[in-house]
């Protein structure tokens, strides 16, 4: 669900109203997204501006080339949402021109290779290779196009979602610890009555309060787009996963 929320946020920003309505309608009817999100590359993870996947017109055909990695559901989703540099309209500036494309996974030239992971087995990842994939102009998402500036802000949403998962795991661990402290007995009494156990549970509760505060503050900053957005998200990202 967290992955779906993030993917829908991306579509909402880069698609026009009609394109987003089609994706949302299908999601409401089926409960699953139809596409995999392909942004990260082997040499362009956090350094997204080093993206090498590109589109270029060759003999009047629009061609996509490149490689994406850590693509969720990359082997199974019928469509792929790909971020690529538009080589046809390169211009001087801080940010290279970037566009998003929603294309069928079974296009000629698209290959998927599974990534073996230790955890998160419910969400399979894959590496995707695009080898001279011919694109139709209809595959391009035609919503508001602010390129990397827009993408960087959306990644802040993803960091909030990830830290929310960490907070959820911490709360689940707290509930398990409290349940065990109430059910386990030693010397004829519940171990939760021992001062050392009480202190451990108190420290856990303090950490959860701190995590909640930082998460909600960062989420509010992202929603409002305030000047402290990047700082709030960075502090949350630094503290919450480690505390969990």
Q: PLM features: what roles do these ranges have?
A:
Residues 44, 69-75, 157-161:
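Glycine-rich phosphate/pyrophosphate-binding beta-alpha loops
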Residues 45-47, 62, 103:
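Hydrophobic, small-residue-rich alpha-helical packing segments that form membrane-like cores
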Residues 30-40:
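A short, Trp-centered hydrophobic/proline-enriched beta-strand micro-motif
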Residues 67-111:
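A short core secondary-structure module
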Residues 131-149:
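Long, acidic (Asp/Glu-rich), low-complexity accessory segments flanking structured domains
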Residues 14-17, 57-62, 127-129, 153-244:
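Alpha-helical interface subdomain recognition
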Residues 50, 106-136:
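Flexible, small-/acidic-enriched active-site or ligand-binding loops
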Residues 1-31, 72-79, 222:
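Internal helix-loop-helix
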């Amino acid at each position: 669900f967290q992955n779906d929320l993030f993917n829908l946020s991306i579509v909402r920003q880069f698609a026009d109203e009609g394109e987003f309505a089609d994706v949302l309608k299908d999601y409401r009817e089926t409960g699953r997204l139809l596409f995999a999100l392909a942004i990260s590359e082997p040499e362009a993870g956090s350094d997204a501006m080093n993206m090498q996947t590109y589109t270029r017109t060759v003999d009047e055909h629009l061609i996509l080339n490149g490689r994406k990695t850590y693509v969720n559901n990359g082997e199974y989703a019928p469509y792929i949402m790909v971020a690529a540099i538009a080589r046809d309209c390169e211009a001087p500036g801080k940010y290279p021109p970037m566009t998003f494309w929603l294309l069928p996974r079974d296009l000629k030239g698209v290959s998927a290779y599974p990534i073996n992971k230790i955890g998160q087995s419910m969400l399979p990842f894959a590496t995707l290779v695009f080898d001279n994939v011919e694109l139709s102009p209809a595959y391009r998402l035609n919503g508001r196009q602010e390129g990397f500036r827009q993408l960087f802000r959306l990644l802040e949403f993803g960091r909030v979602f990830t830290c929310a998962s960490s907070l959820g795991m911490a709360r689940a661990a707290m509930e398990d610890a409290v349940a065990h402290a109430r059910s386990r007995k030693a010397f004829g009494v519940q171990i939760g009555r021992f001062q050392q156990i009480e202190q451990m549970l108190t420290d856990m509760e303090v950490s959860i309060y701190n995590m909640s505060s930082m998460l909600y503050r960062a989420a509010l900053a992202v929603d409002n787009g305030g000047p402290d957005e990047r700082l709030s998200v960075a502090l949350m990202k630094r503290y919450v996963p480690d505390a969990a």
